[in-house]
Amino acid sequence: MEQPMPAERLVPSLRSRERSPIPGLPHTLTELHLHVGGAVAPHVLFELAHEQGFKLPVRDYFDFVDLVTSNPDKVRNLEDYLRIMHEWTEKIQSSPAAIERSVYEIFAKEYRGSRVGRMELRFNPMKRNLGGERDLDHIIHAALRGLDRACLEYGIRGGLIFCLAREFRADLNEIIVEKAIKYRDRGVIGIDLAGTEAHALELVPESVERFAGIFARAREAGLGTTVHTGETPHTAGEGVIAAVRRLKVDRIGHGIRAAYSPEAMRVLSDEGVTLEVCPTSNLH
């Protein structure tokens, strides 16, 4: 994500590392919503798993692809999709070497495959440190090295968004925000709130107040803000309204249920909040 950008900027990104545009190209695409846990090619995950000595439940590569790939036959809801990430991709990416390569490969793949020259990539660093076994700063530094390498080699512009977790204790989410602020001049450009919407925290007044303080601190430090909400009936249009009015976010992740709420649509329009719509995943 790039910093909260005023309307006159090119795109409503959160916070920009103003990297030079690619010379000679007529245009490039922009990607605002991409997760490290869902964007690494299966063959890269397979290699990373073996490099780290993970004991996988399958030995054949194509069985592994099926294991880490979401499809309508086995993913019936958001919880099913998140389970794939939590059980396998996040675990495989939980080392400095693995997260560095993952970040690099995503940026490189998106540019080579679709000429995405400006991209914001998000992940929860605390879900990449094996519950505290890995040092959090080492994980973050490694991710930033992957970003730097991709930007150097491909001339792209990019930044990292740190995801808070709905299921985390407040003190853990506060640590993530502190790390985002610490590395805001190195390529961390914003924060997000992600996780199962069954934990509809934005609809619980005391939870909203707690997160409002966290998001305010991030904004004051110059970070952009976005929230996953309005993707499922658990949060619906009410979640979108709460995120905009109470958390004062710059953007909304998904937010497709706002389409069923005239009030939510009015709030989005009045406040100029962008929806990070993901047609492929939401249609599936």
What residue ranges belong to the model's regions?
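Metal-cofactor-binding active-site regions of metalloenzymes
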Residues: E2-T225, T232-G239, A243-L247, R251, ...
